[in-house]
Amino acid sequence: MGARASVLRGDKLDTWESIRLKSRGRKKYLIKHLVWAGSELQRFAMNPGLMENVEGCWKIILQLQPSVDIGSPEIISLFNTICVLYCVHAGERVQDTEEAVKIVKMKLTVQKNNSTATSSGQRQNAGEKEETVPPSGNTGNTGRATETPSGSRLYPVITDAQGVARHQPISPRTLNAWVRVIEEKGFNPEVIPMFSALSEGATPYDLNSMLNAVGEHQAAMQMLKEVINEEAAEWDRAHPAHAGPQQAGMLREPTGADIAGTTSTLQEQVLWMTTPQAQGGVPVGDIYKRWIILGLNKLVRMYSPVSILDIKQGPKEPFRDYVDRFYKTIRAEQASQPVKTWMTETLLVQNANPDCKHILKALGQGATLEEMLTACQGVGGPSHKAKILAEAMASATAGGVNMLQGGKRPPLKKGQLQCFNCGKVGHTARNCRAPRKKGCWRCGQEGHQMKDCTTRNNSTGVNFFRETHPLVGVQTRELCAEHPREREGSGAGDSTDTSGANCPTTGDDDERRVLPQVNLWQRPMMTVKVQGQVCQALLDTGADDSVFCNIKLKGQWTPKTIGGIGGFVPVSEYYNIPVQIGNKEVRATVLVGETPINIIGRNILKQLGCTLNFPISPIEVVKVQLKEGMDGPKVKQWPLSKEKIEALTEICKTLEKEGKISAVGPENPYNTPIFAIKKKDTSKWRKLVDFRELNKRTQDFWELQLGIPHPAGLRKRNMVTVLDVGDAYFSIPLDPDFRKYTAFTIPSLNNNTPGKRFQYNVLPQGWKGSPAIFQSSMTKILDPFRKEHPDVDIYQYMDDLYIGSDLNEEEHRKLIKKLRQHLLTWGLETPDKKYQEKPPFMWMGYELHPNKWTVQNITLPEPEQWTVNHIQKLVGKLNWASQIYHGIKTKELCKLIRGVKGLTEPVEMTREAELELEENKQILKEKVQGAYYDPKLPLQAAIQKQGQGQWTYQIYQEEGKNLKTGKYAKSPGTHTNEIRQLAGLIQKIGNESIIIWGIVPKFLLPVSKETWSQWWTDYWQVTWVPEWEFINTPPLIRLWYNLLSDPIPEAETFYVDGAANRDSKKGRAGYVTNRGRYRSKDLENTTNQQAELWAVDLALKDSGAQVNIVTDSQYVMGVLQGLPDQSDSPIVEQIIQKLTQKTAIYLAWVPAHKGIGGNEEVDKLVSKNIRKILFLDGINEAQEDHDKYHSNWKALADEYNLPPVVAKEIIAQCPKCHIKGEAIHGQVDYSPEIWQIDCTHLEGKVIIVAVHVASGFIEAEVIPEETGRETAYFILKLAGRWPVKKIHTDNGPNFTSTAVKAACWWAQIQHEFGIPYNPQSQGVVESMNKQLKQIIEQVRDQAEQLRTAVIMAVYIHNFKRKGGIGEYTAGERLLDILTTNIQTKQLQKQILKVQNFRVYYRDARDPIWKGPARLLWKGEGAVVIKEGEDIKVVPRRKAKIIKEYGKQMAGAGGMDDRQNET
């Protein structure tokens, strides 16, 4: 500081301090402005020593002047300061900054004109650069014009003594400064002026060197390269190459690539830059620099995307910090200067917090930034809060506050507040609307603030702080200092009883002194003696130093500035001062200065031995209960061996000592058996409890985590740590009311003593509720830590924790230490034994490395004799390995254990299974690794066909780096084809990807677009088709045959049919052709469906290459329309083989027994002596009904008594309903009072749809707009018509609005939200939206307006289409559900009433009364009773119903004395 401040001395310093910062302003230049200017020059890699003389100042001015127009406010302020300093050195008399800047700009203009008029030869003879010679004539360093006084050459092109221009490589210091700028600033707006300053006079070669120095920013450099290429191409278009020879003495004109330094040499660049333009000179360095700045502007917009509209002052943010952020962002805004000026004038005030906004508005229009900063200094931050607090304290204790410099105001009443700003009573300075009072709030004088005021509090000043603190004199409780004690467990070494500052003393017991133990329900104030002076002080563990006010200490002191509550505070630092607290005295460093309250900091607290004691935070107990009507388990303990009894006794002693179990007496009637097993590879025992009976009786729980996290979903992190929570379940408390049900007994040897009984106080191992409760508790414990560190990955599964971050090693370890301490405060220990901080990390069965992951080592079993259990374990390990090992198969191995077999039953390995196992072993020999997920790259999934119905797939982002692999061998049905299998596999991969990454990958499928489209058109029951593309990876999927949609005119038509007798199982299949041919075949032990298939087989066998087949069997149509290429049925397999040999096939259906030509003939042919033929009526009426209402086939079959095949054919013949047939899935049943609601769009209008989940009943209407108000109206209408207890919607803004919340609250409706586009959520209403639109399309031509068509479609869906459970319409099903629900509730009430009665009864042959039995139902003529496990029906005349009043003594009364009911 001294070196920089010494640039001016004597008269020059006086002149400097007499110059005003602004014209007509009061503030003047001080030495601190020189210090600031020197620091700024060093930031821009310029030598601060240049400020010592006029020549150096002029060089700085020339360097900064090009950046003034586009530079930041800091650059402009630095330029102005150097201009003033130049004038002081040059002896120019100026009054303020503006005059100095005008003088400098005038000299710059003169020098520029002289430079233009002077010839190149004259400049060389002078041997100097005119640019670097100050106009004042005080020249220096004439031989090397670009050399700084310190001797370093910052500018690349220099002129030697002979006047020859040569290149000086750019200095390492300049490159280092540029790299530091990028590392510290990134690509924010400050980079551009810094680059401009560092690259002044540089050649393209040097500019490329600067870009190469930051080449690790690949994305930014690529964008910069694109901008440079565009500008180079534009240069080439504007400056085409000249044809013909080059003129003598002229340089060639550079191309765009030459300017960028790609195709030009360094010598050419120097010549272009130093040669006059008349001789072909081109400033290639400046041009290239301009191109780079254009690219940097683009990078600033990309890397600093924050809009100026988003910059708002926080409630506690200092105004100066807010202004810094505001101007930093506005520099990055791509707008004209008038627009930026308007933004500054408007948004700077508009986005300030309320405290500052009141003050800024009071300043009026046109206030300068300096006035704003002055007025808002100390407002809004912690210092302002401290002032308000002190103001309130002063108002409460002092009689009044005198803010006026003149007369006194009347004393304030108790509880009144007085403003520090305006002096009025009734409000505080924070809420004062008067203009911010300038000057000091203590002495009233202007020119300084209160923190800099040297005047002490007196009668004429402001009584800002109280002389006596309100808590002085309040004596804290004195307790004996806590004796050091060992804590059982893993040494979580802090005491656990109190929360506060505990101050024990050291020394022997006889010298132990008493110090207070302070709880934090009040401020920890104590009486302190500082060098014999008594005062009150606050114990502050957050303060580094101890600070006192209004005390006078003896001894030497040094000045110091510290950051205090009110900003920076000047203090005096005294060393080795005696400080006494209680009866203990220490010597420490003490600071004396202006502080609101005396503070004892850590430097003294540490010497006193004070500690902060945190109690273990109580974990919230989850309430648990048994299932309704059940009692706890009462299972007797089975016998145990002597060594097991001894082992269990020792284990339970330890658990009881740790408080995890507690002893119970005989009053607890419940018991669960226990036993012990030895741990693997050790002689220690492990206690196990058989909670099977308790699990049956305990309420059900919902697993919060549906699966384990997968490493493929992890992001690549610099630092990773894996932790394990020790004794996880034993760290979570069990519901005290439920503990009695966990009681168990340790028996004694030979029953020499009663068994020892215990019950669990924590979650027991093996109990069904432990996993769910532990997951829930662990999540609540980790939530605050997750919110505090959002950039850190924390994966939690049961007691395993994965923590990944991009911090450096030291910061990451601090983070892990903080997490472990956080868990420890809740009583959760993370033992060092399972603490992993170095790779490889063993986690969840995986092995994690910094750049890859794999599964842990897999060892396949190789027993001498294979059993079912061995095969099961083998398949499980292979399935686990298949997630990263590509090509694993298990189909043949799974065939070995088909059926119901015992675990120990031997299995003979088939040749195919042995071959499959050997292939898998070869795959596992080579180590395979997986990659980590990168959110910036797209996700792809490649699928390969392995044959025999087995498939394999890989999910990856980069070729050769698989995230995950897998296999698939699920067959969707008996008759299938490869495309149906492919659709199932795509569905599986899609679900996996949504779970792991939250997105669906792009699929690479081994099927051509024509094949897929052909099958998709005919077989439409694919619920979801992803984005995909064809890859030519054999073997490809293909359709081996295709069914035509139109008959083949030249081909023979075969009418086929089959018949079978249900009783004799005899049948016949045959066909009749349109050319007079016919044939039949008798069948044994067959069915109607098999006979129909045999008829098709006969027709295919006897037909040519092209054939038309007509059948009346819907079963045959269903099998063959799916285009199967494989089947488990022999007859279907034969048909498939024959179909593949045909060139063209047409398959059609006609209704049976309707007198249709060929069908009637073949029906008679195959039915003779086999079955009777029936004829139907009502088909025409059903056809008319469907044309009007488009009912589904079940409604037609019910209403008109038609067979399903006929009703389905009526649907198939309708052009509007045969678009995509009937879905193959059925109705899903849910709770009776749940509705799903969604909004869909049609014809540019909004349709809101509500679906009753259990019945499929729809309420829908067209609403004017998709808002919360309209949605709330619809929900209230729905609740007024039907019982609605719960609605399920997506997260749309209309459903999350306040209006919908209010409507649900008023109607007592529980509102749940789903996930948009997730197949596991909103499925019912999404499906109904689709169906409703199809119905609207069918009836749209019958209605003029869409709202009418919607109502018609709702009516058709609810009352004209049957199906699902009960074969009802949706309306009938809803009424049935509601009626049944009401009847069930009434019945339950009656059952509860009769449960309090007991029944005595007699059998028919036994006159002895039996009972009491439990009454289940009382009817008119009989009663239903339960005795033991038997349920009986007894006539009323043989039963007596007794109300149970409790146990009665034997002999106290007979049957006649008891109350009965007959």
From Swiss-Prot:
Residues anchoring lipid (N-myristoyl glycine): 2
Single GO biological process annotation from the record: establishment of integrated proviral latency
Regulation: The viral protease is inhibited by many synthetic protease inhibitors (PIs), such as amprenavir, atazanavir, indinavir, loprinavir, nelfinavir, ritonavir and saquinavir. RT can be inhibited either by nucleoside RT inhibitors (NRTIs) or by non nucleoside RT inhibitors (NNRTIs). NRTIs act as chain terminators, whereas NNRTIs inhibit DNA polymerization by binding a small hydrophobic pocket near the RT active site and inducing an allosteric change in this region.
Site, Essential for RT p66/p51 heterodimerization: residue positions: 1015, 1028
Cofactor note: Binds 2 magnesium ions for reverse transcriptase polymerase activity.
Domain spans labelled Reverse transcriptase: 658-848
Keywords: Aspartyl protease, Capsid protein, DNA integration, DNA recombination, DNA-binding, DNA-directed DNA polymerase, Endonuclease, Eukaryotic host gene expression shutoff by virus, Eukaryotic host translation shutoff by virus, Host cell membrane, Host cytoplasm, Host gene expression shutoff by virus, Host membrane, Host nucleus, Host-virus interaction, Hydrolase, Lipoprotein, Magnesium, Membrane, Metal-binding, Multifunctional enzyme, Myristate, Nuclease, Nucleotidyltransferase, Phosphoprotein, Protease, Repeat, RNA-binding, RNA-directed DNA polymerase, Transferase, Viral genome integration, Viral nucleoprotein, Viral penetration into host nucleus, Viral release from host cell, Virion, Virion maturation, Virus entry into host cell, Zinc, Zinc-finger
Short motif Tryptophan repeat motif, span: 1012-1028
Amino acids binding Zn(2+): 1186, 1190, 1214, 1217
Domain Peptidase A2 per the UniProt entry, residue ranges: 535-604
A Pfam match: RVT_connect
EC number: 3.4.23.16, 2.7.7.49, 2.7.7.7, 3.1.26.13
Segments forming CCHC-type zinc fingers: 417-434, 438-455
Residues recorded with modification Phosphotyrosine: 155
Cofactor: Mg(2+)
Motif segment (Nuclear export signal): 16-22
SMART domains: ZnF_C2HC
SUPFAM superfamilies: Acid proteases, DNA-binding domain of retroviral integrase, DNA/RNA polymerases, N-terminal Zn binding domain of HIV integrase, Retroviral matrix proteins, Retrovirus capsid dimerization domain-like, Retrovirus capsid protein, N-terminal core domain, Retrovirus zinc finger-like domains
Motif (Nuclear localization signal): 26-32
Its job: Gag-Pol polyprotein and Gag polyprotein may regulate their own translation, by the binding genomic RNA in the 5'-UTR. At low concentration, Gag-Pol and Gag would promote translation, whereas at high concentration, the polyproteins encapsidate genomic RNA and then shut off translation.
Protein's UniProt name: Gag-Pol polyprotein
Organism: Simian immunodeficiency virus (isolate TAN1)
Lineage: Viruses, Riboviria, Pararnavirae, Artverviricota, Revtraviricetes
Gene: gag-pol
